Amino acid sequence: PENQKLYTYNDAYFWGKDFLISPILNKGQKEQSIYFPKNSDWVNFYTDEKISGGTTQTIATEEDKIPTFVRAGSIIPMAKPMQSTKEYDGNKLVLHYYFDEKVKETELKLYNDDGLQNEAYEKGQFEMMNFEAKTSRKTITFELENEVGANFSAKSKNIELIIHHVSKNPNSVKAGCKKLEYTYDSEKKTLKVNLVWDSSKESKVKIKL
C-alpha cells in the first residue's frame, strides 16, 4: 500500500503468496525488467539464484520458461511428474524448502483427501498437514504435524525434503534419535533428505550444520 507505483505495475503478479510470475508478452523478447517486492528476498525457480527484495532487476529470458521466482524462506509442495491427476498420490510428497537464515520461522498447511468424495471436508474425510521450518545459526528444524478428520485414516507419507541454499555438508540429520540418509550437492548447494513419516504422529527432523 505504501508504494503507489505498484498499483499500475503489470509486468509481474503473485501466484499465491510465495510465487512471483513475470509473463513474457512480446515475441523474441530477450530480457525482462522485474520489480522484486521488499520484505523478502527472492529465488529464481530455475537457477536458484537469490535476488534481493525491494530492487528492480533485468532478467534474461528463455524461450521455454516463464520467469518464475520463489519467496526466500518458503516451503513449496510438489509432486513427481505424472500423466494425469488420477496418478496423484497425496502420500508421496516432495517439499522444497528455500532456506534463508534471515527467515526464522515459516509454515505450510497442506490439505489432502482421497479425491473421490464430494464434500470430503464436511464429512471429516480429510487431513490437514502442517509443516514448519525453524532456523537458528547452526540448526534447521523441520516439524511435521497432521490434523486428521474424524472419518479419515491417515497413512504413512513418503517425503523427499529438498533444502535449497545450504552452504555446507551438514554434521548430522536426524528424526528424533534416528539418523536419516541424505545427499548433499556442493555445487547446487542443495540437501535432499528422504523420510517415511507416520502421519498419525508428530515428527521432527533436525539438521545440524
Q: Predicted regions: what is each one?
A:
Residues 176-200:
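Extracellular/luminal ectodomains and secreted, surface-exposed scaffolds of diverse proteins
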Residues 69-71, 131, 182, 206-209:
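Short beta-strand element of the conserved SAM-dependent methyltransferase core
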Residues 142-148, 203-209:
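Short, hydrophobic/aromatic-enriched beta-strand segments in well-ordered soluble domains
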Residues 137-139, 179, 208-209:
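Solvent-exposed, well-ordered amphipathic alpha-helical segments
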Residues 1-139, 145-170:
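Catalytic core of carbohydrate-active enzymes
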Residues 164-168, 191-201, 209:
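C-terminal accessory domains/tails appended to large, multi-domain proteins
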